[in-house]
């Protein structure tokens, strides 16, 4: 199977402008660029849970990436995509953001994302209820703390979250998630479902089946798929869908016959819709 670039080089590129209301009562114009790939949006690759795990292992074993390398690249791309979707000028509440982190790699991506958001001028806080003693995560936590990013001891009620934050980043579970949600994360997801500010999910909306989705679960406004979109992303009906993690080698793209868009310029992420 040909690569995205080779097979769809003749796709149509067009631009348009959207106008949205801001939280401050004004409006903001958004310049959007869309690549129409033979008018078949479905031609983009959506990988299964097993394929995602195999790709991850090949990045580690065959291409000698380390976990912290990929986590840094992924978390940075998340922060850039969020900054594009929710510019500082469009936010009230002093651009406050809550990043909810789980115990695994998705949570690590969230910690990296929080650090970069801070460097971009946002005011992130972190809710990290199940910490780990692994050095990688301890170091990521220290890096956030050294930037005076506050860590919440408990998750406030939905109304307080909605009043206190411009949006909430869901970095609880990634593509390795299976089975039932375990404590304390069931209560966390229940609370997040009741907030009125945007939920922004990293790679997989937490609580979703990685392939089948979850129509009754969290319904984020924003999703950034990492490496390649997972099958559940086909069920995503939110406003912003990005692809990030610009580190997939051509050999993996060819081996898994991935149809992925070409990142523009030096961008670490690309908007899919």
From Swiss-Prot:
GO terms for molecular function: metal ion binding; NAD(P)HX epimerase activity; nucleotide binding. (6S)-NADPHX binds at residues 105-109, 174-180, 203. Pfam families: YjeF_N. Signal peptide: none annotated. Residues 52-260 form the YjeF N-terminal domain. It comes from the Eukaryota. Binds 1 potassium ion per subunit. InterPro entries: YjeF_N_dom (IPR004443), YjeF_N_dom_sf (IPR036652), YJEFN_prot_NAXE-like (IPR032976). Keywords: Isomerase, Metal-binding, NAD, NADP, Nucleotide-binding, Potassium. Its cofactor is K(+). The keyword Isomerase applies. It catalyses: (6R)-NADHX = (6S)-NADHX; (6R)-NADPHX = (6S)-NADPHX. One of its GO terms (cellular component) is mitochondrion. Catalyzes the epimerization of the S- and R-forms of NAD(P)HX, a damaged form of NAD(P)H that is a result of enzymatic or heat-dependent hydration. This is a prerequisite for the S-specific NAD(P)H-hydrate dehydratase to allow the repair of both epimers of NAD(P)HX. This is NAD(P)H-hydrate epimerase. It comes from Branchiostoma floridae (Florida lancelet).
